[in-house]
Amino acid sequence: MLRLVLDTNVVLDLFHWANTDAVPIMTALEGGQVECLADERTLDELQRVLTYPQLKLTPEMAVDRYRRYSCLVRIYPEGEAPPLPRCKDRDDQKFLELAARCAANILVTKDKALLRLRGRTTLGFRILNPAAASALLPPFTLQETP
């Protein structure tokens, strides 16, 4: 099973904007075909971003989006990350560190600073935008119930 780390903007694509590039990720996540990992720092950032006025969310809507996401992810414990390249945007370093610590296969992001690091062979995981990550997902199959 693929293990994914989603940056905050991709989470917003899934749970707020319904971006078409991210729909296959949402389908795979809801269908249990991928494992999505988060930690306290990434969840804290999401909680903070959901209060931004430009999203035009009521407090109830923000809580709902946070709850829906946090119910679908596995919370990974905090810990020491291996040596990693430095992301130009220091706020995004936490996503690199989480992907390395949890042995993710893919860090899914639209952030240019993170995407610039994708050619690094020492990472141990791929850094892809939502469309490229979606192309790697297994085809969705409905589970039949007896």
Regions found by a protein language model. Give the residues of each.
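Metal-dependent nucleic-acid phosphoesterase active-site entry motif
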Residues: M1-N19
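PIN/NYN-family metal-dependent endoribonuclease catalytic core
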Residues: V5-L6, A22-T51
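Conserved glycosyltransferase catalytic-site signature
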Residues: T8, D89-Q93
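Short secondary-structure boundary segments
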Residues: T8, E40, K110-K112
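Hydrophobic/aromatic ligand-binding patch that stacks against planar heteroaromatic rings
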Residues: A28, L98, L117-G119
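Acidic catalytic patch
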Residues: R41, V63-R86
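Membrane interface segments of multi-pass transport proteins and intramembrane proteases
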Residues: L55-K56
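Acidic, PIN/NYN-like endoribonuclease modules and their adjacent C-terminal/linker elements
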Residues: P85, Q93, C102-I106, K112-P146
